[in-house]
């Protein structure tokens, strides 16, 4: 063993005569694969690389040691690192610690990277901003919010920070939904003497949009301009997307116009975002104008672009045009993906062309794609809409054979079909089956069942289900309340209907026009014109104008009451 160790040192003595990079390259060549390293040989090599400022190569060498690619009978990775951190001079040791930390970050070893960071600080060294930011990015991405927040606050006085350090933290806060903390960091950033940049403002705008705080996002955007920061295409895109997703569509399109007026060209993501909203609004023609504009400007389309347009056309039932877009995407070298196929299958199911939908399903399989749970749910729904429960059952059987378990959505589609076809016994049986499989019925499942019982006038059954869902912490929504109110009104039970209306008001849920009309009608039949008038006042307060027929009902009820009182 001593002879091998001596041979290693002799070889290294010759290698150090070469420039550091040449020596490193030689050691990584096939001729040196049987080379037996020692503590000393690695130490010499690292010192050589660090002295030449070849930090990435030093890191590469350590990564090979950590991963076991460089192994030796003379050391383990832990014994080697202990030797290195104990034996090097102060200047080399500082650089060495940073390389060790970076290496463990790159190898995704959270505990060891933090351990060597702590050791570095305990030895009196102050990690530079590059090293700390690299570690901080890893810690933020690999830990819970509370863990990395504590890590930063415990160490911020022990390291060199820069504006990028705060950028990493602000992004982490926004992704964790901790918007207030991100604004605290913005203040702290300035206290450290730094100025926020466009990236930080863009991150904050995106975070506010995702949290639904759209006014804050807009304020930040205009604050940027006052500070002399020029919004880039990403800044505009996240704000436009946020405005759309928060229902402020008009302002979203205005921001898109402003972007171009300010000389900022939309990128692929901006165009996709705008086209998506236009398609959702049923403005597919306008979406294609945007599509033509992006192509004229030389912006390359991607699969999302085409899927967006195909989805818009399918929603408008323009399936022949959707097929033409598929042909165009293929000619542009973009192959349809599962989303493309699911969109088309849904479109053809929507117009009752199940044969074409099944043909598309076969086509996607022939192209090496696998139908997903979504694919099968679309097909099951398509068969159910046509009243073909045996076809739906075949789809369920096929999905199970392919190892795809029916989901809550699958069962709810089937339950809805049987409930609407007046087969409540089968609908309830399916609900019990899904519960046996561990699938908990959600508000939509209960909604279709309650609707089925209400249509049949079986209000006792509907009431039992209503109570059951409340007991199971499944909160009834507006649809269920309105369905129950209509059911009780048809039964002539104004007391129960009004009781549910009161519950809705307490939960800040809104009765619909039909609920108001049926309740007023029942109250008028019971000659309770004053209660009916109070409901009309509630209608007006909630922004619903009572129709002429409702006002006529009350007028007749009042006349009847007046006549009977005589």
From Swiss-Prot:
Family: Belongs to the PPR family. P subfamily.
Keywords of this entry: Repeat
Positions annotated as PPR repeat: 93-127, 128-158, 162-196, 197-231, 232-266, 267-301, 302-336, 337-371, 372-406, 407-441, 442-476, 477-511, 512-546
PANTHER family assigned: PPR CONTAINING PLANT-LIKE PROTEIN, TETRATRICOPEPTIDE REPEAT (TPR)-LIKE SUPERFAMILY PROTEIN-RELATED
Nucleotide-binding found in the keyword field: no
InterPro entries the record matches: Pentatricopeptide_rpt, PPR/CCM1_RNA-binding, TPR-like_helical_dom_sf
GO biological-process terms attached to the record: mitochondrial mRNA modification; response to abscisic acid
GO (cellular component) term, any one: mitochondrion
Pfam family of the protein (one): PPR_1
Protein name (Swiss-Prot/TrEMBL): Pentatricopeptide repeat-containing protein At4g11690
Keyword Acetylation: no
Superkingdom: Eukaryota
């Amino acid at each position: 063993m001593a002879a091998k160790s001596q041979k290693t040192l002799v070889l290294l003595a010759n290698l150090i005569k070469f420039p550091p990079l040449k020596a490193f390259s030689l050691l990584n060549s096939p001729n040196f694969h049987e080379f037996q390293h020692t503590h000393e040989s690695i130490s010499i090599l690292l010192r050589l690389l660090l002295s030449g400022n070849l930090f990435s190569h030093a890191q590469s060498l350590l990564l090979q040691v950590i991963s076991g690619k460089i192994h030796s009978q003379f050391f383990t990775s832990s014994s080697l690192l202990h030797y290195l951190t104990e034996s090097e001079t102060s200047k080399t040791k500082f650089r060495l610690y940073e390389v060790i930390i970076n290496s463990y970050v790159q190898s995704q070893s959270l505990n060891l990277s933090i351990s060597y960071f702590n050791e570095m600080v305990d030895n009196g060294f102050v990690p530079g901003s590059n090293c700390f930011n690299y570690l901080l990015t890893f810690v933020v991405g690999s830990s819970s919010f509370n863990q990395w927040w504590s890590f930063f606050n415990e160490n911020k006085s022990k390291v060199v920070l820069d504006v990028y350090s705060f950028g990493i933290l602000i992004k982490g806060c926004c992704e964790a939904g901790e918007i207030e903390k991100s604004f605290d960091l913005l203040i702290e950033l300035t206290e450290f003497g730094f100025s926020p940049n466009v990236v930080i403002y863009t991150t904050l705008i995106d975070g506010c949009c995702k949290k639904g705080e759209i006014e804050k996002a807009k304020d930040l955007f205009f604050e940027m301009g006052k500070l002399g920061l020029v919004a880039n295409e990403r800044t505009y895109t996240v704000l436009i997307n946020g405005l759309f997703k928060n229902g402020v569509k008009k302002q979203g399109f205005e921001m898109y116009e402003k972007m171009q007026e300010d000389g900022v060209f939309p990128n692929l993501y901006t165009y996709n975002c705008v086209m998506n909203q236009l398609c959702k609004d049923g403005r597919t023609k306008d979406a294609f104008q945007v599509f033509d504009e992006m192509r004229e400007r030389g912006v390359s389309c991607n699969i999302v672009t085409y899927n967006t347009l195909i989805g818009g056309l399918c929603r408008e039932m323009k399936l022949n045009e959707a097929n033409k877009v598929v042909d165009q995407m293929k000619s542009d070298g973009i192959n349809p993906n599962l989303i493309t196929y699911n969109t088309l299958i849904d479109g053809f199911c929507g117009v009752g062309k199940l044969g074409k939908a099944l043909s598309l399903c076969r086509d996607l399989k022939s192209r090496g794609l696998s139908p997903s749970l979504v694919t099968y749910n679309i097909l099951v729904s398509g068969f159910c809409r046509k009243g073909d429960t045996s076809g739906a059952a075949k789809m369920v059987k096929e999905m199970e054979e392919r190892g795809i378990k029916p989901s809550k959505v699958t069962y709810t589609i089937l339950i809805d079909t049987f409930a609407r076809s007046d087969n409540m016994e089968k609908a309830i049986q399916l609900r019990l089956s899904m519960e046996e499989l561990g699938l908990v019925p959600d508000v939509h499942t209960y909604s279709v069942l309650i609707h089925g019982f209400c249509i049949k006038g079986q209000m006792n059954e509907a009431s039992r289900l209503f109570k059951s869902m409340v007991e199971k912490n499944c909160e009834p929504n507006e649809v269920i309340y309105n369905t129950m109110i209509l059911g009780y009104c048809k039964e002539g039970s104004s007391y129960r209907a009004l009781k549910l209306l009161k519950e809705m008001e307490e939960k800040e849920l809104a009765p619909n026009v039909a609920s108001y009309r049926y309740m007023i009608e029942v109250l008028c039949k019971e000659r309770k014109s004053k209660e009916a008038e109070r409901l009309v006042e509630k209608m007006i307060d909630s922004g619903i104008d009572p129709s002429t027929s409702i006002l006529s009902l009350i007028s007749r009820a009042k006349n009847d009451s007046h006549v009977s009182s005589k």
